[in-house]
Regions:
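N-terminal lobe/hinge region of extracytoplasmic solute-binding protein
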Residues: 61-109, 117, 140
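Gly/Pro-rich hinge or "lid" segments in bacterial periplasmic/extracellular proteins
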Residues: 178-232, 238-241, 343-344, 348
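Ligand-site clamp/hinge motif
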Residues: 219-262, 401
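Append "and occasionally in soluble cytosolic enzymes with long acidic Gly/Pro-rich linkers
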Residues: 291-390
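Ligand/substrate-recognition segments at binding pockets and active sites
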Residues: 357-430
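Extracytoplasmic/peripheral linker and loop segments enriched in polar/acidic and small residues
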Residues: 403-412, 437-499, 519
Length: 519
């Protein structure tokens, strides 16, 4: 081949090699430099988005637009939960229901009087002074409101005396400070039904043409270190859509109290905490068989409370054989009844009570009487219905024959209030001082079937006055139970995964550390 031909072949080969190399480079992964540039551009876009939203991103919380944000008239759960964000109180309660001073500088309980001194220099979010007269005004509003009425039912009045607030109670209560977590509003700022009262909380609410925005309160007493200058409130009108609103990103946080007896799995960061909702087995004290302390003790020992909490309530409850929340600070160091089932001990007690024979139905008999009862339950609550069936099976296993009567809510309420039951499965929300007034007060919501002259009722009243200790009452209650505690229910707080910082929620404040959240 001539030299010129060789040169042409070499040139053709070089052209082909260059083309192939170029094609190969088109399908190659981008270089590290290219990836870094892309990420930097994305971060810049996020940074700009955050800047537009006040420097920290846009946080959205649920509320019900058709409901009020007034802490004394709000009916919906989301709006009630926002109360601790918009309004401070004299005291807040921590995760163990221990009262922590917020607006209060000090507080003391003496007999039927509670004396509270305010911190100095307190101001509302509008810059006006917060005084003792605002506290008295708020107390009177709270005591008449559905949300706070029960927890303040033992308080008869409040007045200003030498700059302090003096509360007068109807009965002695050593744990009264835990009840003083009602919202404090500026006197007269709730003059209209649509008004959002002025508060002193971490945020204030600003109403726009068609929306409500929360603005950080720069005058907050603890120094506002919140990462969000503003928070959007998003209308979530019904409880069925609240989980969906979180999962699609419309809101960043929700709270569910599971009062309907159903749990739906949530795709988010979640935390659960004990609420004050006590599930209990009500007892008709007029039934002669249920007046026998050994029968009642046996029933308590026969209950597998942990199994009920984990199975019937799907883990959203904590077993308790005492009528107080297991994590209540006042119980620390005390001896409390165990929650473990003990069928052998239960059977022994029944035999000691004279029920040493077993009939054809499996029920124990003695002295011509049979341990056979009905158990009323609201069939519309799946958690409670499942618990009732488990309780019936557990009691029947030791010879206490129980037949579950499933009733619609209206019929169930009528039966309980009318005393037409042997046993009933109920639930009551205790106030933060763990008052058992719902059971032992003549106007109590859970007084049905209880002997108000019985040993447990008498011991409880003595405990409040200091005549006997809390430990003494627990011992008396275990020996002579007026009702059988089963468990305390839990609530579920859920937050979108893009929000960072610890998620601290408890029964006193589901937004306990809102100021620490960030994107």
């Amino acid at each position: 081949m001539k030299p010129s031909g060789i040169v042409r072949w070499i040139a053709l080969f070089l052209c082909l090699f260059i083309c192939l190399a170029s094609l190969a480079s088109c399908g190659r992964e981008p270089t590290d430099e290219a990836s870094t540039a892309a990420v930097s551009g994305e971060e810049a876009a996020i940074s700009e988005s955050q800047k537009n939203a006040g420097g920290t991103g846009k946080l959205s919380l649920p509320y019900v637009k058709g409901d009020s944000l007034n802490p004394f008239t709000a009916k919906s759960l989301p709006n009630q939960m926002l109360s601790t964000v918009l309004y401070d109180s004299l005291y807040s309660v921590d995760a163990t229901l221990s009262p922590q001073p917020l607006l209060a500088a000090s507080g003391s309980v003496s007999g039927t009087q509670v004396r509270v001194a305010l911190k100095s220099g307190l101001v509302f979010s509008d810059g006006s002074s917060l005084s003792a007269s605002d506290v008295v005004y708020s107390f009177e509003k709270a005591a008449a409101s559905p949300h706070y009425r029960a927890q303040l039912s033992n308080f008869s009045s409040a007045k200003v005396q030498s700059g302090n607030i003096i509360f007068t109670m109807k009965e002695v209560d050593p744990y009264a400070l835990s009840c003083l977590d009602f919202a404090i509003i500026k006197r007269g700022s709730d003059s209209s039904e649509t008004a959002i009262p002025v508060g002193s909380g971490r945020y204030s609410a600003v109403r726009g043409d068609s929306s409500v925005t929360l603005k950080a309160n720069k005058s907050w007493l603890n120094g506002n270190t919140t990462k969000f200058a503003s928070i959007s409130l998003v209308d979530v009108p019904d409880s069925d859509s609240v989980i969906h609103s979180l999962e699609i990103g419309n809101v960043n946080f929700i709270f569910q109290d599971l009062s309907g007896g159903v749990y739906q799995r949530i795709n988010a960061n979640t935390t659960e905490f004990l609420m004050n909702n006590l599930v209990f087995l009500g007892i008709q004290s007029k039934n002669e068989l249920l007046q026998n302390p050994k029968v009642l003790q046996a029933m308590s020992l026969a209950l597998a409370r942990e199994e009920i909490a984990s199975s019937a309530y799907q883990g959203h409850a904590a077993a308790s054989a005492v009528p107080f929340r297991p994590d209540w600070n006042a119980l620390k160091g005390l001896s409390t009844a165990g929650v473990k089932q003990n069928k052998e001990a239960a059977i022994k007690l029944l035999q000691e009570a004279g029920f040493d024979k077993t009939g054809a139905s499996g029920a124990r008999t003695g002295g011509g009487k049979t341990l056979q009862f009905t158990l009323a339950v609201n069939k519309e609550n799946p958690f409670r219905l499942s618990a009732a069936n488990m309780i019936a099976a557990q009691l029947s296993a030791v010879g206490i024959k129980v037949t579950v009567t499933q009733l619609a809510w209206a019929d169930y309420t009528k039966a309980v209030q009318g005393g037409s039951f042997d046993l009933y499965l109920g639930e009551v929300k205790l106030s933060n001082n763990m008052s058992l007034a719902p059971f032992f007060d003549e106007a109590g919501a859970a007084k049905a079937g209880i002997n108000q002259e019985g040993a447990a009722a008498a011991s409880y009243k003595q405990m409040l006055t200091g005549a006997v200790s809390l430990q003494d009452f627990l011992s008396t209650f275990q020996e002579n139970p007026a009702f059988l505690p089963v468990c305390f229910r839990k609530g579920v707080a859920a937050r979108s995964r893009d929000v960072q910082g610890d998620l601290i929620s408890h029964s006193g404040d589901v937004y306990a550390n809102l100021q620490d959240w960030h994107f």
